[in-house]
């Protein structure tokens, strides 16, 4: 997965997390063996890195030290982050910079579409920072990016990973009307953690957003992801699964939270691979079409391959229902 920011700020680098500067340092737990990966050295990785540098793009994968960077870049998987690199929220888990965002780049939709075509992407994920400063939360910009990709690379399937559009009436409806193939909105964590982990969001607003997508377009695939290791209890994770199934969400991803810096929320535990497998089994039993659950699972990890499996799972379900 290549997470690509849309611009390079030529100005002096801002303090990345000013809102966290006052927080005491927290202990960073040593990663267990099952989290560690080899350094990226493949030809495909080098080629992807060259493409990124050629287009003068910045990647969160590099800055955040994503554990999947070698695997994803080797396969030229890409996730574009639109609407700038500065977020209006300050979630305790996230390494994206917080502050006052810059104005939208009106050329960005076409530039993203050109990159998708030049990289030959069969599946692309479009995500963004939160833009609470915009009247529509960036919905129109999402719409324009989707349209531009459809025009430049018609065969590419499009997955969007959106913010929650909190207090932005009509924003969700506009994005759904643009017809992405997959609508992803991450719950991030269980309800009991929202005040400390995701204070700018509302748990049941996010559940309702995912439910509303299905009401607007029952054929659209919906997806959500969470992190574990933030102090949640198992029963809270199972309740979250039930809430997502009530919203008819198709695809659930579960991955291990990794602490970006000492100023971020600490890792409370490293969940074992066996526990991840158990979560996967339970999630399938609750009716999800697709489940990805492992320590290194990330929301856009294997997104293209998973989309193909997701479509196949739906077709199988429809055939079984027709018998």
Curated annotation (Swiss-Prot):
Binding-site residues, [4Fe-4S] cluster 1: 61, 66, 72, 300
Leader sequence residues: none
Named cofactor requirement(s): [4Fe-4S] cluster
InterPro entries reported for this sequence: Aldolase_TIM, Elp3/MiaA/NifB-like_rSAM, LIAS_N, Lipoyl_synth, rSAM
Pathway this chain belongs to: Protein modification; protein lipoylation via endogenous pathway; protein N(6)-(lipoyl)lysine from octanoyl-[acyl-carrier-protein]: step 2/2
Protein name: Lipoyl synthase
GO molecular function annotation: 4 iron, 4 sulfur cluster binding; lipoate synthase activity; metal ion binding
NCBIfam families documented for this protein: lipA, PRK05481.1, PRK12928.1
Family: Belongs to the radical SAM superfamily. Lipoyl synthase family.
Cellular location(s): Cytoplasm
EC number: 2.8.1.8
Domain Radical SAM core: 73-289
Gene encoding the protein: lipA
Organism encoding this protein: Rhizobium etli (strain ATCC 51251 / DSM 11541 / JCM 21823 / NBRC 15573 / CFN 42)
